[in-house]
Amino acid sequence: MGVLEAIWWLAVGHVVSDFVLQPEFMANAKHPDSECQREKYGPWWLWMGGHGIMNGAVTALILGVWWVGPIEAAHHALTDWAKCKGHVGFWEDQVSHALMKGLLLWIVIN
């Protein structure tokens, strides 16, 4: 797979894993300060971790290298946690995800 094709698939994978496969209840359930969601769906870290792992798995599958999965999962979950806590906004969150995917691609191809 060429670089442009990898960028394309990373973007598609991000849209699918960060939006399509994250329904509204998951976006709410992964929020650390959402007491009502905790009673309904369980601990926030379970949903945040699951969402991060899903993003990491998609990235690892696209790049074909297993070790990018845990790195992407941790980064994705930490960035989303920062967004939930109000430390970064939506666009900073999305740019951070894109930059990490770009960095991982650069490391893999070099």
Question: Where are the regions that the model predicts?
Answer:
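Interhelical loop and helix-boundary elements at the membrane-water interface
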Residues: 9-55, 73, 77-108
